[in-house]
């Protein structure tokens, strides 16, 4: 199991495999519709990959897209707030310079620290909600009083934290994130414009859009404020900055209490300006510092958490399990994403139906289903869609594009979700087991749908006709069959299908294409379902066992049919003759005998058959195809049963035994003919000579000899024969073919009887004995020649 899990993670799909990156110039050229389409697809891909545990950390492009999404939705509100904030900052700056330059008089200012009361973390937890609210009101009022008279220019960290605590209960999440971003931007602009100090280790510049760019001097990477700013703390001015760095760390720990992600933060103390490192990944990337190394694997990592995650993937360890769904994860990040899908309510809720969503664009797409707007239309079939991702997946059904390929087996898929489900098949993570039959499934929805087979639940009802179904697809197919909605026609035979996938699978019967190949024996199949059933013959995987006789089967339907033999149940009865059958297919074939229907007709000779298998066997006679070949002697057969009978001639296995004389045979039909000799059954009688025959074949051969009818004629010499087998043996004289070869000496023969007589010379067997002198012979013809001497 550990090996399967390790192999699964080795070929895991990451977000980078499915992501498409644009440069700044390319992004500017995209119109709003194209940007929305790109954002929806990227966010959906990231959500699918993160949900199954293949993406541990949020990529920078996703963070940036989320910010772009929030900026677009709240642009009007944020612009008003930014203007108000900039006005207040300008007023504070003017008041500050008035105090500094008024008559050169230096005044002793009252600061917030002199009137503030601070609590430790332990003391804060002991306060009840009323005491916390009172404390917040007093501290905020003191800060407003000092700010109004200009005695407090910079906002203390305590006030920022209290404001966040207050706003989290009243303001939406979107405004909260962007308000904090603007709060940090205000002091940063004041530092850059008035103090004119250079940021440590960072060169400040602006691009053509007015966005701030930061150039790291160690690795020469350039960063902007979106999607994520990661900078290095300078080590050049270590002498007098230890206290400031400690101050910055304290502020950072305080900010982490309220938000796990902060893009940019600038703090000032003692006249120094610093850019906090919210993510030290770039710093270690620049210095190539990989302090954590796995001794068993020889791999080095930047963080201890990375090493622990890698160790779990190698050992297959899964410590993070959610009891509600039963899924276990190697990484806590994947576990957190799974828990969030179960217990955390998404912030964007639909007012019509109450459904909630994680992203606002998903809510907008959902609202279109209520108002009936489907802006994305397929040019091929005219089908419309509400979301671009569904439209792109549908287009791939027309183009045949499958961009998501499995690295292990090479199978391709049109969606990333399909690839993720397929990768689970390689890992064989079937943790959800059915208590009734023991069948295991990869996901809980698959198990939930399977349980409906046992309990008979049919939640999907067709209101017009009153029919109920276990799946939603059953309702759709029934509606199409009743309304006549069948749009997919086969150009070759004219057959109509309700879906493109059904038509695509049907076309393989015309083209003979078998894309699903067994990697063990090389046998091809037209569908993946047939291949899965075939693979069980190699692995001997028989999951469904009969409790009465112990016989096991590869499919649940086979077990169900087998159980009817124990119970004697025959639910399918013929209304005309009363005969009952265990399977519906047997009844369908039986009814064709009453009606004389033969739906399967040969296009070459016009012969019709009641069963498709009979037509398939008949077509092989036209094409000469003999797919069942025995490798030892090279003989091939049209049907598999003939190959099985032929194998018994090599092995000597004779399962059909006569109870009267204990003589055994390799074929049941030969035993049936032998039993007629004991019963003295001679049903066919010749009117010309008066002889009786046990079967019709011998009777017809006798008639041919009397009437001298020889319908089988040789094309080379013109010689005619009464039997087709005699013509086949005669043709080998012209062709020189000798298919029957002796394994002992290598001698070859034209007929099987010739080889059998030859084998008796090796074994010393002489079954033909003379009645007069008792001498035995290996062949019947030798005995006849000997009788002439007497």
From Swiss-Prot:
Is Transcription regulation a UniProt keyword of this protein?
yes
Which residues does the UniProt record annotate as the domain KRAB?
A: 13-84, 110-181
Zn finger limits (C2H2-type): 284-314, 348-370, 376-398, 404-426, 432-454, 488-510, 516-538, 544-566, 572-594, 600-622, 628-650, 656-678, 712-734, 740-762, 768-790
Q: Per the database entry, which stretches of residues form a coiled coil?
A: none
Q: Where in the cell is it found?
A: Nucleus
Q: Which UniProt keywords apply?
A: DNA-binding, Metal-binding, Nucleus, Repeat, Transcription, Transcription regulation, Zinc, Zinc-finger
Which processes are annotated in GO (biological process)?
Answer: regulation of transcription by RNA polymerase II
Pfam entry (one): zf-C2H2_6
**Entries under InterPro entries matching the protein:** Ikaros_C2H2-ZF (IPR050589), KRAB (IPR001909), KRAB_dom_sf (IPR036051), Znf_C2H2_sf (IPR036236), Znf_C2H2_type (IPR013087)
MF terms from GO for this chain are:
DNA-binding transcription factor activity, RNA polymerase II-specific; RNA polymerase II transcription regulatory region sequence-specific DNA binding; zinc ion binding
Q: What does this protein do?
A: May be involved in transcriptional regulation.
Q: Which family does it belong to?
A: Belongs to the krueppel C2H2-type zinc-finger protein family.
Identify this protein by name.
Zinc finger protein 560
What is this protein's gene name? Answer: ZNF560
